[in-house]
Structure formats: structure tokens, C-alpha cells
Amino acid sequence: MLLLRRLTAALFTLACLCGLLATGGTAHAANPETNRVATWNMQVGRDRWQGAAAIAQDNTVLALQEVPNEPPAGARYIGTIGNTIDHYEWTIARGVTRQLYILYTTSRNLAIATAWAPGEVVEIEGMYRPALMVTRPTDDVAFASIHAASGNGFDVRPLVQDVADEANGRGLNHWAVLGDFNLTPDRARLLGLPADARIYNSGQATQQSGNELDYMISNVDTEDWQATVGDNRGSDHWPVYFSALRAGALPPELTIHADNSDRLLDVFQGNDTNGTHVIQYHANGAVNQRWRLQAIGTSASTGHMMYRIMSSDSGKCLDVNRGQQSGWGDYLNIWDCHDIDGVPGSGGNQRDTQNFTLEHPDSRMPNLTLLRNNATGLYANIRNNDRGDGAWVIQWPDQFGRFPAPNESFYLHPVIANQ
């Protein structure tokens, strides 16, 4: 049965006439993935608008769920779109504003804050709760905030499909749905989502239950929406940020967590001596758990970009014990970074054991990453599938069948500046 849709729209031209263009936002981007986006379930708390403002300051799009009935301090009422969406110009910091749209519902309110004036603001009626969608014609994309039904997320598939249909109906080729799906990504992937849908997730718990419920589903194909779980801001959900591994002249810091253990790659005891083991260890905020990527060229064997994975602590590069003579089971370590051409090793940068490619064997889960050593063709692996602190990171042949092996699967999380 066709779902009834109630659509309301705010034209970009009217927004301009009313002086709604945000200040403090970014310049128009060339592609959908150049938008930095985030999602957070506020759990209705009126006092959580301050946390939402901090998240919005770091992102061009913020999707919110369980939004309180009262608007935030510093929000100037602009008008009502249709009967249910209130529009505010929201001052979130000195000289920085966001366009805030709150959709009032009989269940839980939704909101979206943007650094730009949307082309349209649309309510899409759902089986249980609606979706709130904004369009960005400049980037050929629509963004939507959803809060799926509790328990089993039975309405996820139709909500995502409706957003995709509404975006396509407006001549937009791309769409992204963010929110609380009340369903883990592993279950969401089995729902019969649109054929081009991808699930951008952090691989970590986002709710106090220990489940991962907050993420993004989109048809955009990119490595630039890596997910990071932010600090708790008073809700029973954590905010999730989506941003690039590479940005500007200085690559951002990142952490790398193993899917089998939820622990981070860590330079043993913060030692900066050549040959120091790389292990897994629980997150402690230390600099020896932070890394940077340096693009180094293209792999001749796979066609993928090669990266140096550099320790933020020592500036040394991830390498493998015994270098080009290494084999199955040799441990990963840090070492003085080689020259771009692989010197002092031989064979040029294609034979340099400090060069890794990021592989995504499951196209529908683009943040799930394998770290492949370009010289040896072997993969970073948590030895013996150990889940405890101190386990060695070794290299090993790939083990993935239908799905990648958890101890060879990693998530890369850009570090969030304003925590």
C-alpha cells in the first residue's frame, strides 16, 4: 500500500529574501561528501541544546532526534513551514549561526541544523514516525533525520526508501539518512535497502545499552564519511560525527580500532624506539593511540591509494618486523619513516613495507577497513583473535569469506577537535 506523504517545502529563493543565509558556514562544496555531518539523539533534555550547539559548530549538517519542545537559547524564530516545522536562525557561537528546523510530532520531535540555507525543507510521513529532509541542490544531495520505531526498527526500510524517492523526485542524485535507527547496522543491511545504499557506521556502541543504533545510510560512495563517536553530552545516546581522513595540508589525527575487541592500535608504552611493537589497548586518550595518514602514491597491484600510517606520538611509520623478508605472523612495529621512493629499502615505493592500502571488501559497509601491506600483500591482524589489552598486531593472509574476519577488520575514526 502506498504510504501517505505530507510534503512541505521552503523555497531557497524565499529563504534568501528573508535573510536566512547562515553566517559562519563553509563555502559551497563541490560534492555531497564535502559536507561534514553528525547525528545525535538528545533524549528530550532541554539542557542539551548547549551540547547540540557544540556539535553543530563542527558540522555543516546536524540531524537531531528526541528534540525538546522548547527551542534553544539564541534561536530567533523565522516562521513556520506548513503546520509542523518551525524555522529558527540559531546563534551557536560568536558570529556563527545555523539554520534550525524543528519538526513537531505526536511522538518524538526531529530537527536538522545546517550551515547553509536549504533549497527545500520537507516532512515525509512514515508508518510510525516521519522523516525531516532538507535539500542541498549545490551539492546534488538531500539530508534527512529519522528516529525509527523502538524495538526492531520495522520502519527503517520504508523510511530510507521514501527519502531516496523524494530526493530523486526533486532531481537530486544523492541522499543521506542520519539518525537513531533502533537497529544495529548488521541487521539494517538485511532489510532490503535501496540497491545503492551504504551504511556508514562507527563499529562502536552509540547507546547506553551497548548497541550501535546511530549511524548514516546513504547512496554516496566515499571514504570521507568515517564515523567517530563523540563524548557523551547527557543523553543516553552518544553523538556520531562523519568526516574525512584527509583534510587540508595537515591530515587530521585518527584512531584505529579493531572490530573484534573494540580496542585501539597503540604503540607499546608510548615508546619511540625503532622496532617498538604495535599492540591493541583500551582507549585512554593517549597520543600513542593516535595516527595520521600520508598519501604516498598508487598501488600498482591494486590501484588503491597507498598511505603511510604515522604515529602522532613519535612521527614514525607503521612497519613490519624484518621488512621485505617478513612473512606470515611477523609483528607490526614503528620505524623511522623511509624516503618517498622507499630508500633505504630496495625496489621503490611499491616494495616499501611502510606503505598500506585501505581496502573495503564489503561495498555496503564502506567504513569497515582492512589494512593491507602493499609490499607483502598481507593484512594487519590481531594475533589469535585476542580481545584483551596487549595483543600483538601481526600481518596475516586475508581470512574473509562472505564477511571480513573481525580480527582483520578495523574502523578509522578522525579525532574530533571540540570535545
Task: List each model region and its residues.
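Active-site regions of metal-assisted phosphoester/phosphodiester hydrolases
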Residues: 30-55, 105-250
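Residues that flank catalytic or metal-binding motifs in active/ligand-binding sites
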Residues: 33-36, 106-109, 128-130, 139, ...
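Soluble non-cytosolic domains of exported or imported proteins
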Residues: 42-47, 66, 150-154, 259, ...
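Residue-level marker for beta-strand->alpha-helix junctions and adjacent short loops that shape enzyme
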Residues: 69, 182-184, 188, 272, ...
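Substrate-binding cleft of extracellular glycoside hydrolase catalytic domains
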Residues: 73-117, 121-128
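Extracellular glycan-recognition/adhesion modules and their associated mucin-like linkers
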Residues: 248-272, 290-326, 346-387, 405-419
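Aromatic-rich beta-strand patches that line glycan-recognition/binding surfaces
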Residues: 276-282, 330-336, 391-397
